[in-house]
UniProtKB/Swiss-Prot annotation:
There is a cross-link at residue 348 (Glycyl lysine isopeptide (Lys-Gly) (interchain with G-Cter in SUMO2)). Residues 237-309 are annotated as: Disordered. Pfam families: TPP1. The gene is Acd. The modification Phosphoserine is found at residues 25, 313, 317. Keywords: Chromosome, DNA-binding, Isopeptide bond, Nucleus, Phosphoprotein, Telomere, Ubl conjugation. Residues 296-309 have a biased composition (Low complexity). GO terms for cellular component: chromosome, telomeric region; nuclear telomere cap complex; shelterin complex; telomerase holoenzyme complex. This is Adrenocortical dysplasia protein homolog. One of its GO terms (molecular function) is telomerase inhibitor activity. Component of the shelterin complex (telosome) that is involved in the regulation of telomere length and protection. Shelterin associates with arrays of double-stranded TTAGGG repeats added by telomerase and protects chromosome ends. Without its protective activity, telomeres are no longer hidden from the DNA damage surveillance and chromosome ends are inappropriately processed by DNA repair pathways. Promotes binding of POT1 to single-stranded telomeric DNA. Modulates the inhibitory effects of POT1 on telomere elongation. Residues 237-250, 259-292 have a biased composition (Polar residues). It comes from the Eukaryota.
Length: 417
């Protein structure tokens, strides 16, 4: 006790935690804060309701510790105001007579720490100003002891839970497997309501379809594979005309209707002028069918060395009904006429060879630089090669293809009924 009447506290909390862990004699502490006040059980409360008492923060002047006061300690104390609880008693001195050290394991948001469980105490009327001090669990030596105690606690809990051997665990797993198998068999027996089900055997088609999953399958509509009567008549007439053209007596004596059935894109017609034997052949002409009547005095195909390419476009009248064999021949005689139109395409003059003086075998065609409306081309094309020019000249359309195209065009022009 000092001259001013203030009681000087002696540090004892740290030594208690690191030493004996129990009080050998009563120790005085300063009540700093009431963390949880005690609740006096009333007559309406259940008899088995647990009561933890009060939770106080007590200091020895150097360190502070959390003290849990049991309900039994509160009931047996000589404190006269215990019915009102610890609220309002902050700053008073607390004499701890019996207490023990406990460890709180970390759970939820509460950290692991040491605390004191108070079994007997006495609250003194002396009151002093409160001074904040450091918690005892923040001391380095106390932290080391806390970690060691937690390791011992975990090892003890692990050893106590290891009561089953490996063989016992395997037996438990086997029993669970047998039980699960019995449940599966019971469920299968409940699901079979109409007896065993026999799957139908797979056909060869189903097996091939299941195996060829990565192959592409294409289908063709049946109406595209059907040949109508009109097409059969046209094909038969074309076959007869083709057989007659295989061994002709003379190209000049070929009938007009049979010569009109075969039309070439670029047909080269040589001339019989004896004065042109030493020169190269004249440029080819382009011939196509036309329904217009041609004058008897006009020549079928005539050309000169300086004449441009000739072409003509087909103009067909609609087909009214299916023609007979005689009418088909007459129709071909009437429709397959030739008409010529000039295309104003510039042709490069033939150049003489440097040594022999002969002309090139084929003229070189240069693509036009502008459209017919004098507008410039958007793209520039190169000059075609001589081999491509030769391939185009020798191209031929078969009579079957020409007749088929003629039939398609004529059918498309029929009026819709």
């Amino acid at each position: 006790m000092s001259n001013s009447g203030r009681l000087v506290l002696r540090p004892w909390i740290r030594e208690l935690i690191l030493g004996s862990e129990t009080l050998s004699s009563p120790q005085a502490g300063h009540l700093l804060k009431v963390l949880q006040d005690s609740e006096t059980p009333g007559p309406s409360s259940a008899p088995d309701t647990p009561d933890t008492g009060a939770v106080l923060l007590v200091s020895d002047g150097t360190h502070s510790v959390r003290c849990v006061v049991t309900r039994n300690a509160i009931d047996t104390s000589d404190w006269e105001e215990k019915e009102f609880g610890f609220r309002g008693t902050e700053g008073r001195l607390l004499l701890l007579q019996a207490c023990g050290l406990r460890i709180q394991v970390a759970q939820d948001y509460a950290p692991a720490e040491f605390y004191l469980q108070v079994d007997r105490f006495n609250l003194l009327p002396t009151e002093q100003p409160r001074v904040q001090v450091t918690g005892c669990n923040q001391d380095s030596d106390v932290q080391k002891k806390l970690n060691k105690c937690l390791e011992d606690h975990l090892s003890e809990s692990a050893s106590s839970s290891a009561g089953l051997t490996l063989s016992q665990l395997l037996d438990e797993v086997k029993e669970d497997g047998d039980h699960r198998g019995a449940l599966v068999r019971l469920a299968e027996s409940c699901l079979v309501l109409q007896g065993p089900f026999t799957a139908r055997p797979l056909t060869h088609w189903a097996t091939s379809c299941s195996q060829a999953t990565e192959e592409a399958v294409f289908t063709v509509p049946s109406f595209l594979l059907h040949i109508s009567e009109n097409e059969e008549q046209i094909l038969s007439s074309i076959d007869s005309s083709q057989k007659a053209q295989e061994n002709p007596a003379s190209p000049s004596l070929m009938p007009q209707e049979e010569s009109g059935a075969s039309v070439s894109l670029l047909s080269a017609l040589p001339t019989s002028d004896p004065g042109q034997k030493d020169n190269s052949q004249p440029p080819p002409t382009v011939c196509s069918t036309s329904p217009r009547a041609q004058a008897p005095s006009s020549t079928p195909c005539s050309s000169t060395p300086s004449s441009p390419l000739l072409t003509c476009s087909p103009s067909l009248s609609p087909l009214r009904h299916a023609p007979t064999s005689y009418q088909a021949c007459e129709t071909r005689t009437q429709f397959h006429k030739l008409e010529f139109r000039e295309l104003q395409w510039p042709i490069k003059r033939r150049q003489l060879l440097p040594r022999t003086g002969a002309q090139e075998p084929h003229s070189v065609w240069e693509p036009p630089e502008r459209h017919r409306d004098t507008s410039a081309f958007q793209y520039k094309y190169g000059t075609p090669s001589a081999s491509l020019h030769t391939q185009v000249q020798t191209a031929r359309l078969s009579p079957q293809l020409v007749a088929w195209a003629l039939n398609i065009v004529m059918e498309s022009e029929l009026p819709q009924v």
